[in-house]
Regions:
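Membrane-embedded helix bundles of polyisoprenyl
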Residues: 15-18, 110-119, 129-172, 176-201
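Membrane-interface coil-to-helix junctions
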Residues: 18-113, 137-158
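Coil-to-alpha-helix initiation sites in intrinsically disordered, low-complexity, charged segments
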Residues: 3, 60, 72, 128, ...
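Structural signal for the C-terminal ends of transmembrane alpha-helices
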Residues: 24-26, 92, 120-124, 167-173
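Start-transfer (signal-anchor) and selected internal transmembrane alpha helices
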Residues: 1-27
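Alpha-helical transmembrane segments with an aromatic anchor "belt"
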Residues: 100-103, 124-129
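Positively charged n-region of N-terminal signal peptides that target proteins for export
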Residues: 1-6, 122, 173-175
Length: 201
């Protein structure tokens, strides 16, 4: 039981740190300010609104006349908003989608810390629990996250990457390929745009 509780510590620590930052800068849920900027303002949030319309039946997945004079949302979905967490937009009021961006970033940072912790615990078994927490939190808040959270689906690559590494390790150590195939397939499905780099890796 103690081991399971230790697995929860890195995501909890990352979530707490994230909430502290949100509170200091008066970001939602502590105020009505959003993290949304740059590409998130111009592309991600409007496309999340489109996804909400598709999920509610107000728009079509394959032909959306409101975009570019009539285009398929399918390609856009696989490029910008195909994260499983994007589906939560179905439960968000349209007026709150900019605030929902904060929730998406928060969730993905927490999950990043969780999967990083899983990798460190499995690969480096002699790590002390505090070392595991520190490394996992640093991974979750690395420079990539701080810069590219504006393209929030890119953070899905961050939380999937430690699982992919575990899959590679299983191929080397145990000659078992299933975890690697599942992780790579999930990453390609979530965001094919970045996955060519992952596949090259």
């Amino acid at each position: 039981m103690k081991k399971y509780w230790q697995c929860l510590l890195p995501p909890v620590a990352s979530g707490a740190l994230c909430l502290i930052v949100f509170a200091i800068f008066q970001l939602f849920p502590f105020a009505q300010r959003t993290l949304s900027w740059c590409d998130m303002n111009q592309q991600v949030v409007p496309l999340l609104l489109d996804l909400k319309n598709v999920l509610s039946g107000q728009s079509d997945l394959f032909l959306n006349m409101a975009n570019a004079g009539g285009t398929s949302f399918w390609g856009i979905l696989l490029f910008f908003v195909s994260s499983p967490f994007s589906l939560l937009v179905a439960f968000i009021d349209t007026k709150d989608i900019y605030l929902f961006a904060n929730i998406l970033v928060f969730i993905k940072i927490v999950v990043c810390a969780g999967t990083a912790s899983l990798f460190f615990r499995n690969k480096f078994t002699s790590l002390h629990v505090l070392q595991n927490i520190a490394l996992s939190v640093m991974y979750a808040f690395c420079g990539y996250t701080m810069m590219y959270f504006q393209n929030v689906v890119w953070l899905d690559m961050m939380y999937m990457f430690p699982i992919l590494l575990l899959g590679m390790d299983r191929i080397i150590q145990k000659e078992k390929v299933l975890l690697y195939i599942i992780a790579l397939t999930a990453m390609i499905t979530i965001h094919f745009y970045l996955c060519y780099m992952v596949a090259m890796f």
